[in-house]
């Protein structure tokens, strides 16, 4: 007899909700804060790929509850975002209404899966009660000099009508396009809010060392921050100083030209009049190229000589000044000293434009750039020195002669923090008639979005909010002000949402971050103990969240400077065709359909059993069928067998061994192998005689199964005569003494040669060993045609059959 998943799921979901089974407790000194990367509530809803990560955190949360931990396992909604705004533009509907509808659909889907979220902790980043604190944190950043309004080169997307951050852009066919919609993106100078994350570069680097994160993610962040130690050397062109950052100042005697990024503010100042038109055309051409294309070393180099020269401060040689797209303005000073003999890109450029090449590091092969280690040559006082020696000497020389200075440089850029959108957090900022910035008082927060039909982009670079004049214009006393009309990026809210869950008393009801109660809660729950989500957030959300946590820690508001103690990146679930799930491929699997046909427990079990949690694997309906088949086997086992309260000890070894292994495997997030162990236990139980299976062992099995199949496990727990939720039970213990295996392996030999082995209980007598050897299939093949056999048996060791 199989179980009815539809009846069971409804029954127990109702029970969990009515009895508030998953409410966060505050009874233990042990805590476990287990967190999903919260979803953006899109209109498409969830697919089975989303379910994988959520199931993993749910399994671990249930495990920790049963181990006696207070568990915080919340859910919320990253609700601001461009998709809702685009929907509103197409339909004329308010994006807030659209978002709330999507949230309700998401909640229905999540509840169907039996996830153990505490909905009293639910948050919505687009709710004013939430973004009141987002606005307050921005104010603190501004007060500490970490938020600035400045004119900068930005990534402008005309189609979306907004500025995009670097992590919101991808490269396609050599051009910059928006990640969402793949619309063209160009560089444009605009006045924007930025957060000075660069001030925290060293703290963010140092903090990575002690995090239990995948090395790949930590390395991505290290490379994104990109710390390099070097020297900034001043080259002069007439009276204009050109600062050049380099990590290889020791090669300065090999500099044969200088290259500026086309965006460098010195370009037009240095360009000769006769070259101005050509230079401007090249600058315009470069603006449409992606950073990825510009960094591509394999492509043909392009550039323009600007008609001016600079002086090498050491050799006093006059060298040409060029602009080229292979030099980026946002690294160093946006200028390089070109040493073509020892840099491949410089070599390719020099070869293309027939520029001089001078070797200053000894090499036998001067037919290509030499980038290895060697002794310096053609370098005056650096001759015969190796790289490390030469760097020390040249840095001292530059310092002593005021030719530059030692400098640490970072690839990390300040965080572009404003968007020309309607649907985002308003800034708590006013401008007076002289354009001075005035912060809105705390007691006037939150500043909410207006109810308006004017949400179309202005196409002037301003936010749609600029159209809402009765919102923009503010009068306080006899003074008139204008509101900031840009809104914050979606990444603002996600930079502190893990804190918001702790502050939540009930849905979207947050206590003050600065209160004594907040301090008490934060000290208990932070940092997050396990955070599961995709690696694609490595240099976006994960970096920004670390920055805000470090900042709030420095304000004395948090007990830790790192938000996420342990991070795990789950793999993707691919379509049955082994491609990424996509509507365009037609390979998306809807969990609602799977739940209808197979049930939530089968879906949960299958996704955790299909392979290692961090592996990306294709969806298989055969695997799903097998999971349901096994759950039915578990159901039949408990309905079929009458259990005993007396232990006959036959299952002692396998039960205790399985409990020990499953406990360790769950802790290590090896869910697929944990499920395999449960299958081992079920097989062992089926081999036992009816009415002899020890009931506490069956109960221990159901407890372990409940992590993966909570609905069925509740039903089985009730069937065993229990009247409380299996979720609230303690995790099964194992007896180490029962795992000492009372068995030995006996070697079976024929004429002294090993032909087979058997496993028997220790102390098995000689007669039994000989009988088992005679029945062994491999041994039979060797002795079947012989009659004169002599058997030599040694207890616990060997049986040797001698053919006479």
Swiss-Prot record:
A motif ('KMSKS' region) lies at residues 580-584. SUPFAM superfamilies: Anticodon-binding domain of a subclass of class I aminoacyl-tRNA synthetases, Nucleotidylyl transferase, ValRS/IleRS/LeuRS editing domain. It catalyses: tRNA(Leu) + L-leucine + ATP = L-leucyl-tRNA(Leu) + AMP + diphosphate. GO terms for biological process: leucyl-tRNA aminoacylation. It comes from the Bacteria. A motif ('HIGH' region) lies at residues 39-50. It is found in: Cytoplasm. GO terms for molecular function: aminoacyl-tRNA deacylase activity; ATP binding; leucine-tRNA ligase activity. The keyword Disulfide bond does not apply. ATP binds at residue 583. Its EC number is 6.1.1.4. Pfam families: Anticodon_1, tRNA-synt_1, tRNA-synt_1_2, tRNA-synt_1g. Keywords: Aminoacyl-tRNA synthetase, ATP-binding, Cytoplasm, Ligase, Nucleotide-binding, Protein biosynthesis. GO terms for cellular component: cytosol. InterPro entries: aa-tRNA-synth_I_CS (IPR001412), aa-tRNA-synth_Ia (IPR002300), Leu-tRNA-ligase (IPR002302), Leu_tRNA-synth_edit (IPR025709), M/V/L/I-tRNA-synth_anticd-bd (IPR013155), Methionyl/Leucyl_tRNA_Synth (IPR015413), Rossmann-like_a/b/a_fold (IPR014729), tRNAsynth_Ia_anticodon-bd (IPR009080). Gene3D superfamilies: HUPs, Isoleucyl-tRNA Synthetase, Domain 1. The keyword Protein biosynthesis applies. It is an enzyme of class 6 (ligase). NCBIfam families: leuS_bact. Belongs to the class-I aminoacyl-tRNA synthetase family. HAMAP family: Leu_tRNA_synth_B. This is Leucine--tRNA ligase.
